[in-house]
Structures are given as C-alpha cells and as structure tokens.
Amino acid sequence: MSSTIKLYEHNQKAYDALLDMLGERDRACVIKPTGTGKFVIIAKMVQDNPDKRFLLLGTNDYMFNDQMANLAEIAPGFTPENLQFMTYSAAMMTARRGEEISGYDVVVADEFHHCGAEKWGKGVTHILDANESAKVVGFSATPIRYSDGGRNMADEMFDGNVAYSMELEEAWLRGILPIPKYVIAFYEAPKELGRLAKSIAGIKDEMVMKRFQKKYENLRRSLTEAGGVREAIAKHLKKRDAKVIVFCPRVAKLREFMLLRREWFGAVNSEIHAYKTVSADPYGSEDFQAFKDDESDALKVLYCVNQLNEAVHVKGVDAIVMVRPTKSPTVFYQQLGRVLSSGGNRTPLVFDFCNNFGSIVVAERIPKRMEETFKRLTGESKQLPFTPSDFRIIDRTLTFRQLTDEIRKSLKQQAIEDKITFLEQMAQLNGGKL
C-alpha cells in the first residue's frame, strides 16, 4: 500500500491555488525557489488523479531519477504509473522526426523557462500541438530568461496565469529555506592587485597618481594581512567533515583547483576526499554518487563543471564555492540553490571567490529585496522567524572595488580632459574654429 503525499503548508497553498486556476483555465504555473519542493507538488497532483495521464518535461534523466528517489522517501510505496518523463532534448528529437506523442491529460513543464530556448521550444510546441486538450502546468524558480532579452516565460507560455509565486527572500524570512552566510573574497588577489597597479600607472596627473598609489599600498597591505582563500575558508567553515561543492568555469580550471585542495581546505581538515563531475565525464555520475554516499570524518569536496546547476538536490551540503564567474542571474541562483536545498548546516556557507554577487544586479539587490519583503509580510501581520539582518555578507573585496571604481572614474575624467585639450589645440590651429 502506498503512502499518501502530505505537503508542507506553503506547498499546500501553492497546490490549492494551482488546482483552482486549472479549474477555470487550461494553463497555469507556479513560481517557487529551488529547494522548496516543487516536484512534490507535481507528485501530489499525479497521485490525486490516478485516472489521468501525465507527461513531465524536464532537463535531464538524472534529475528525474533523483527526484523519484527522493519521492520514495517521502511517500514509500508510491509508484506513479500514470506519469511519464521526457527530456526537452528528447521532445526536440520527436519534433524533428515528426513523431506524434499524444494521449496525455496533463503536460507538466519543469523549469519551464527552458521552453523559450529555440530548439527545445520547438519540441515543447510539438508536444503541446499533439495534446491540444491537455492542461499545461509549469514550475520554475526563474521564469525570466535573462540572457534572452529578459523574456518572461510565465507570460509567453502561460498567458500570465501565475497561480502561486514565492520569491527566495520570502522563503528565507519565513524559514522555509535556510539563510546563508555569504563570504566574498578573491582567489586571485595578486593578479587583481597587478591590474590595479597598472591602471594607477596610467594616470598622468602626478598628484592624483601619488594619492592612488598611497591608497593602493594600504589596500595591498590589508589584503595581505587578511590572507586569501585558505584563511577565508578556515575562518568560516568550522565543520571538519563538511560536504562542499566547488563550481568551476571549465575542466582545465577544475584540475587546477583540485590540485589546490590542500592549500584551500587543509586548515579545516588534513583528510580531504576529492570528487569531480563534468558533463563530458562518463564516470562523473559514479563520483557524484560516491560524494553523496561518503559519510566519513573526512572533508568531502566535489568539483564540478556544467553540472548540478539545476534540478539536482544533494542532501547534507554545508558550503558551496563559486569560482565560476557568471553574469547570469539564472546560473547564480541555481548554484546558490544547491546549498539552500541541502538540508545540511542550518546556516549554509557560500564562498564567492569571483565576485558574482557584485557582478549581477539581481543578486546585488538581494538585501534591498529582503527589506521590502520583510516590510510587506509584517504589514500583512505575518509572524516571521527571521529578519533581513540574518542575511550576513562578509565582503573582503569591498575596499578594493571602491578603489577600482574611483580609479576608473579618474581615468575616464582624464580621457575627457585629453579630448578637450586636443579639441582646443585643433581650434587654435584653425583660427578658433573646429
């Protein structure tokens, strides 16, 4: 006998709102942060409607298998035989072959922002055309396609029918997701200092240059005294047997960072178990599983490239390390979600060693949105267990970035003054005319 799926209060509200909207309309979506249990809502709908056939579209097979494994823990004995899974890539191939995939009562698009992609979108359209009478349901944490002109797929695909929406800041303040401690530092401080020194050397005004040189020397000294990556990790990561995920930009960098593991993490624990997973590695899934299963006293570190960004949940992760620079809010939140949904340390750690927080406008506005959300929720007489001040940002690069901005403005002003001088000289040569 299978277990009945029971939803947390916030998911029950989302589920009820979704059913209400589907009672009136053919399409509806739910927007909730990663880690709040979107798949459980899907499973609940499938369980409550055994006479209906569901087709779930998602990004990869591993995601579905991972979610089904989690479902087995939540609802032992429940095997949803009326649910079929298909990747967006497979849907695209059926469209190319002209193969009809029909007979479904409900089509569910997980991470539905992907439906706006040119090739995957054609596959989704092909599926929906073959199931014209089906209800269409979508789930996503990030409905906006930031890299695609800011397209809102909730509007495009669901006609703006958002049944329920919760932002990350609300999930934090309500205690649905743990609020992380966010540490910003440089992993290449000497290189960054070298670039800054070169910029200062380009200043023509000697007095201005000397002023910046003095500031630079104070900054260099403070960065040296504060230490680098090793010191930052040792200061904040106190759990010796922690599980850590390191997001790397490419395979070459992954190898480099793996070689640095003792330098970076050695002050936390001398015994380090290192694992890696990359999209092109046939053994990556084995390493990933070994990382998840490792319950030893060692510090466990998983290095990854183009993996674990989306829809994959790892229990017990205590920290993530960002060394993959990105301008994409979607990628930023996907990586952040790996530690928020982990169920590990109550105060998970985020080590941002490439200033993603300061490089992405959406991320930089998190503190302000926390304040706005807190004001809105308390105005609705909601009792909140956390306040905006619980989101702690330790920024070891702030002074550096402020000085860099100041120098950049000075160089810009210098360039403007050079242009004015040039124009004045041209005017003199032409009898006062340009």
Task: Give the location of each predicted region.
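Conserved RecA-like helicase motor core of SF1/SF2 enzymes
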Residues: K300, N306-N345
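Walker A/P-loop
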Residues: E24-M45
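Interdomain helical connector at the RecA1-RecA2 junction of SF1/SF2 helicase-like NTPases
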Residues: S2, D148-A242, K382
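SF2 helicase catalytic motif II
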Residues: E99-I144
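Long, largely alpha-helical accessory region at the distal end of helicase-like NTP-driven motors
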Residues: K214-K235, K243, S359-L434
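Conserved segment of the helicase C-terminal RecA-like domain
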Residues: R338-P367
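Inter-Walker segment of RecA-like/P-loop motor cores
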Residues: D61-G103
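Conserved helicase ATPase core of P-loop NTP-dependent helicases/translocases
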Residues: I245, E256, V268-L308
